[in-house]
Amino acid sequence: MVVEEEAIPVKDAVRGACEMLGYDVYQVANEGKMVCVVSADEADAALAAMKANKYGVDAAIIGEVCKKPEDRGPRVSLRTGFGALRIMDMLVGEQLPRIC
């Protein structure tokens, strides 16, 4: 799977806070978000359905599943703004959500 970094909707305040604190924006706890894996044939319809809801206004297609595992290996890769690929590693340790 290849995820396009520039396609992931991240609010400026969140990105700025992560940069100041040295956090990886893709590894911090995040409530109220969803990732869906949808057939390419249905992607536009699924996106339109999500955007039709007030909670889905920032919904976006952020990547694609590669046809052959050998194309990218068994991992999720992130294509950076510079076009380079890097592995999106699994979180190490505990992800602590905000305590309400």
Predicted regions, residues:
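Short gly/pro/ser/thr-enriched loop/turn and capping motifs at secondary-structure boundaries
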Residues: 8-12, 34, 66-69
